[in-house]
């Protein structure tokens, strides 16, 4: 039991170094596409030049679990928690059960957003995997988005600086990156949400 609790707290390591928090200098720069017909996954992103903690977040446009376009900038005025997870990660699966309860508890001024970066094989998640994630975690109003590794970059210069899964990025009501953390810690997650609300 202790092993599983430690695994949930620390998260799944990738080939990247695991960071306790996302520090100053965390930046995002995602290639922009404008006229290409999007497929499931990343539709496009904009305003992504050197977005550091305290700066405006990049406007990600992804597909949600209903295969509808989901745009981050549509949620200005809400506290947003981005959860970067993978299907293959045990701690991500365990933490996934908190998404809908947190969404329900904090209500309309808060949005818990799961971005599935990889499926079970390390490739982008399939529709079946996303549907299963939604079903297993009893998600009804908390968005689950199709993502992939193009959102990530250990240096933080060309994507989110992710060192392990799950990684959480907190965005304030003005769409500024506030802080990030690796691994689910319920009291910490709640304290940051409450601070930003």
What is each PLM-predicted segment?
Residues 84-101, 122:
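Conserved redox-active cysteine motifs that mediate thiol-disulfide chemistry
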Residues 10-11:
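C-terminal motif of bacterial Sec signal peptides marking the signal peptidase cleavage site
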Residues 78-79, 94-117:
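Conserved helix-turn-beta segment immediately C-terminal to the redox Cys motif
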Residues 113, 129-167, 171-173:
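Short, internal strand/loop/helix patches
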Residues 163-197:
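Thiol-/selenol-based redox modules, centered on thioredoxin-like
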Residues 1-7:
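Sec-dependent signal peptide recognition
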Residues 16-19, 30-73, 141-144:
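N-terminal "domain-start" segment that seeds a small globular fold
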Residues 78-80, 84-88, 119, 164:
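Short pre-active-site segment immediately N-terminal to redox-active cysteine/selenocysteine motifs
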